[in-house]
Amino acid sequence: TFTPNSHYWLGQLYFAKKQDKEAVKSFAAVVSYKDSNKRADALVKLGDIAARNNNATQAKKYYQQVVTEYPNSASAKVAKTHL
């Protein structure tokens, strides 16, 4: 469906504007769609937001989740660079 993609791009907009609370809401909505093709990317972005807000432990959890759930994806390669 288009819904997760809409949430993803809205999250990207908020992320770029450093409106992290809104970005987290949008990316979390994407993650709730287990079959979304943007789910792994949204998890990376949630990790990026956590890292930007000095929450290294939470960031690592998001990045590790990407590597575990999507091991052969481009998102996993990105996540690994942050671990």
Where are these regions (language model features)?
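Short solvent-exposed coil/turn linkers within tandem alpha-helical repeat scaffolds
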Residues: 1-3, 32-38, 67-77
